[in-house]
Regions:
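N-terminal, charge-rich interaction modules
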Residues: 42-106
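Short, well-structured alpha-helical interface segments that form or flank functional binding sites
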Residues: 64, 68, 124-126, 137, ...
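Nucleic-acid nuclease catalytic cores
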Residues: 140, 145-152, 165-191
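Nuclease-adjacent, charged terminal/linker segments that flank catalytic cores
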Residues: 1-68
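Conserved catalytic cores of phosphodiester-cleaving nucleases, focusing on short active-site segments
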Residues: 131-146, 160
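Active-site metal-binding core of divalent-cation-utilizing nuclease and nuclease-like domains
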Residues: 90-132
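Hydrophobic, Leu/Ile/Phe/Ala-enriched alpha-helical segments that form helix-helix packing faces
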Residues: 1, 11, 15, 73-77, ...
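Short, charged/polar micro-motifs that form catalytic or ligand-binding hotspots
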Residues: 59, 63, 121, 143-151
Length: 191
């Protein structure tokens, strides 16, 4: 399944040797691309480390799904702190003025974009969004993975970005975030 190639480590050895990978075109169609680094982004070193006062809850470690990683980080208010800053100022605000959380979902849409001077039209492209936060017309989309990855396939956050960017909603900014969980640590990347 080509959609499971979310890290270049998962590419077949022949692909690595030939420096090729797959670009999703939607409806089960793909295009071979020369240059793995064109579709996979290497994670940057973490520049700022924050110790968080973890408050264990009953279900926090009951399962290790990607959705649960996001739920734990959300319930601990880590996601809001990472994207919008400490949310103590929201304590007295009515709910409609507080940051909103939208949990994992899939949707289909047609995406149009340029890649290497070629117009790509991905018809009926399925997009999976692990989590979305929204506050004051700023949207943050999240992809989450368990384990240590060296890189990720850009489409995992670019397709959701393009979905919201093309929406004609009055958005001020779209932040693409990647969250990695490795045992007791969380690493956040924003693009």
């Amino acid at each position: 399944d080509a959609t499971k190639l979310d890290s270049s480590d998962k590419l077949p050895q022949l692909f690595k040797e030939q420096d090729i990978c797959l670009l999703h075109l939607g409806s089960g169609n793909h295009k071979f691309i020369k240059g793995i680094n064109k579709l996979y982004h290497t994670f940057e070193p973490i520049q700022e480390r924050t110790e968080w006062a973890y408050k264990k809850s009953l279900l926090n470690e009951y399962n290790d799904s990607e959705s649960n990683i996001l739920s734990v980080a959300n319930n601990q208010r880590i996601l809001h702190d990472f994207v919008f800053g400490r949310d103590l100022e929201f304590e007295n605000l009515p709910i409609q003025k507080r940051p909103k959380t939208y949990f994992p979902h899939r949707t289909k849409t047609t995406l149009r974009y340029s890649f290497e001077n070629e117009q790509i039209i991905a018809l009926n492209q399925q997009i999976e969004i692990d989590l979305t936060l929204e506050f004051n017309a700023v949207v943050a989309i999240f992809e989450a993975k368990n384990g240590t990855l060296k890189d990720f396939n850009i489409y995992q956050i670019y397709h959701p970005f393009l979905y919201y960017y093309s929406s004609n909603l009055p958005l001020q900014n779209i932040i693409c975030c990647y969250l990695l969980r490795n045992e007791n640590s969380l690493k956040f990347f924003a693009y």
